[in-house]
A protein has these predicted regions:
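Active-site-proximal cap/lid insertion segments
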Residues: 1-109, 122-132, 178-185, 194, ...
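Non-transmembrane alpha-helical segments in soluble domains
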Residues: 34-37, 41-48, 52, 116-120, ...
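C-terminal cap/loop subdomain of S1 sulfatases and analogous C-terminal strand-loop tails that border
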Residues: 68-74, 101, 108, 113-116, ...
Length: 235
């Protein structure tokens, strides 16, 4: 209740101004949001303390993550299902004191679906990972035994139907998305997050070479996954 909301907004160019619909939405709800995640933190702490008191913590893999983020008014968006970092980025904390040294890795591209093969491998079941699994076993990166980066982009799908909605991809440096309405592309978005972390400057118009590159990658993936949206994209 004592949070200085305006001080928080002062360093966030993506938060709309006070007095606007989404600006007020953020200011009215951010305290509740922080109260919620504080409660989550306290209860995760209870689990950790129980593991420690039973002598299980050192050799237990604990994963703290989430299925999605939330915009909370940023970019004039209230919820999720959008390509902005507030929606797409999630916490990913992996603890295994006996095997993983504490560190922060901001460059490892990992998605929720990668946990399946990665956890199997960490637990000694690498050979049991089905050949049909299309996501990445990142166990060596998690253990700090490999600095090899996974360069495969992660793809983004949000649709009202197959003819309307967004498709896109996210690399380690860029976010790319296209929108179609009734089968016609009507918006292209490209952000360089290394220079524009709050995604305020759409550089699609100034970077046709990158648009072509990402468009080609995206189209190939959509064809691979039998998504008819691929036919709306230029070759």
């Amino acid at each position: 209740k004592d949070m200085d909301v305006e001080a928080l907004c002062a360093n966030r160019p993506d938060i709309p101004a006070k007095g606007t619909e989404m600006g007020n939405y953020f200011r009215n709800n951010i305290r509740n949001y922080y109260a919620c995640i504080t409660g989550v933190d306290e209860n995760v702490g209870r689990i950790i303390e129980t593991l420690k008191s039973n002598g299980l913590f050192e050799n237990t893999i604990v994963v703290f993550t989430s299925d999605h983020g939330i915009c909370m008014g940023a970019h004039n968006a209230a919820g999720k299902d959008i390509f902005y970092e507030e929606s797409m980025r999630i916490p990913m904390i992996i603890s295994w004191p006996a095997k993983i040294k504490p560190r922060k890795d901001d460059r490892l591209m990992i998605a929720f679906a990668d946990l399946y093969p990665s956890l199997l491998s960490l637990m000694g079941f690498r050979k049991e990972i089905p050949e049909t699994v299309q996501t990445f076993d990142l166990s060596r990166q998690i253990l700090g035994k490999s600095k090899k980066e996974v360069v495969q982009p992660y793809y983004y799908v949000q649709f009202d139907n197959h003819a309307t909605g967004y498709r896109g991809l996210r690399t380690a440096t860029h976010t790319f998305a296209v929108h179609a309405t009734n089968g016609k592309i009507d918006e292209t978005v490209l952000f360089d997050r290394t220079k524009d972390p709050y995604q305020m400057d759409n550089i699609a118009g100034q970077s046709p070479h990158l648009v072509r590159q990402f468009n080609k990658q995206l189209k190939a993936w959509l064809l691979h996954t039998n998504d008819s949206f691929a036919h709306y994209l230029k070759p």
